[in-house]
Amino acid sequence: MPVDHIPKPSDGAVTGGFIALYTLAQIGAFVAFIPMLNLLLPLKAEAVDLSGKAVLLSQVMVIGAVVAGFANLAAGVLSDGTRGPWGRRRPWIAGGAVAVAATHGLVYLADGLWSLIAAVVAFQIALNLMFGPLNAVLADRVPDHQKGTVSALQGLALPTAGLFSAVVLAIALGGLAERFLITALAVPLLVLPFALLVPDHSEAGLPATRPRFSLGVLTDRDFRLAFTSRLLVQVSITLNVLYLLFYLQDVATLPSASGATAETAFGWLMTAGTLGGLIFGFIGGILSDRTRRRRVLVMSGGVLMAVGAGLMVAQPVWPGPLLAQIVFGIGLGLYSTVDIALVAEVLPDRSSAGRDLGVMNLAITVPQIAAPLIGLGVLLAFGGELRWVFAISAVFAFVGAIAVMGIRRVR
């Protein structure tokens, strides 16, 4: 039964059924790209070029991120202007979910630099055609007094995807083909129920004019500060995601008695950090609705991420990396969850929510370009010493955390 057939609360709040399916769809969207970035693509780069894996990974990530930025902005503009029986967002969400599954197969089959680049480009286009319109649903459909609660559940998507990557892919499964297949199947299974069962009436009452490509929303001071904060923190996140496995292989001293490999240690670190992020992210989202003080919670999350990245520099001997990733994960869960609600409130115009969130998404995709370049520059400057990459990560997280406190429209 379509979720909108469930009686609606009189205050305009979204229903429990809507929230449940939307949360599952968000988890599916994050499962689409978190395992790809932190495990599948690094392992594929290693399989294609063992000796040059870090450089190859950086090259592929930069090109893919450029494509992702344009694709997400295009998806936002296109879905803002889409009209029809399926509404503005649903056609793009459903079609993108199926395409993401197919492009996982392309990445797996790639056997060289150019085929891997082509596969990642196709993957990023499919991902962002799904992800941009899905993110716009929060601004379209959820009233302000529920944004923190829905964001608390939506914020579970990132750490849950990390848990999927750590437990299912890194620990439970051993073959690269199995890892790609399970991920490809999980995405449409989680995303399509929302796209198929929840009617989209977000275009009701909006002007018939179609939004255009524009970066004009960056002239809004509060939006610009939220963008800057997310941009800086995402550089920190991307550096941690990209180089954690290589850090465990080449820098960390793992417990010799346990016989742990870098991949299994990666799985356990991701699991520990994810569990911390799940708990604190959920609590933070609920508190941000009840207190309506989102900025200080976002700032606290960014500061904790900076502390965690700093511990990676200072304590490479076990259990230092474990403690570092727990602290980083707690900060990431808190920051990412509450920041979702903060950004949804900062948007100046509902009719162009998809486009403006596409602009905001540049704060995620630009770091996917910048972070590999920064990481590569640091590695070249410091003789391949990975600990300096995490030192830079700590600086970006801290500055990004402080930036959010200048926002005025949201407390």
Protein language model features and the residues they cover:
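Intracellular juxtamembrane helix-capping segments at the cytosolic ends
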Residues: 41, 129-142, 334-348
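Central cavity-lining transmembrane alpha-helices of secondary-active solute carriers
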Residues: 58-79, 268-283
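Juxtamembrane intracellular "pre-TM" segments in multi-pass secondary transporters
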Residues: 2-15, 201-229
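A membrane-interface helix-boundary motif in multi-pass transporters
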Residues: 88, 171-186, 259-260, 377-397
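Helix-loop boundary and gating motifs at the non-cytosolic
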Residues: 6-65, 224-229, 233-259
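Glycine-rich segments within core transmembrane alpha-helices of 12-TM secondary carriers
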Residues: 67-69, 148-170, 361-372
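Structural signature of the two symmetry-related core transmembrane helices
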Residues: 89-105, 296-311
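Helix-to-loop junctions at the C-terminal end of transmembrane segments
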Residues: 71-86, 280-293, 379
